[in-house]
């Protein structure tokens, strides 16, 4: 599970030791941006579209691809239609989303193809 910035940064090394990656975007975003999404005073800063978060996600996906292992994503970002085109472009293999997000996520993925 890639949930911390440090794990994403060394994902090239971790990829040699595991069979797959799952990127946990809720924690990855929170730890990267140093915000608690449940804290109203700072929750507006919680956004997986921030460049630092995007770079960590892209790095992790690219390192998984180089190592020949599948990579999936869970958390709110997996269903974020602003992010799905990038995830498709980078080669994300699996999107794990809530049941209420399946249809719009599937539609967004189909629009990428």
Predicted regions mapped to residue ranges:
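Conserved alpha/beta-domain cores
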Residues: 1-113
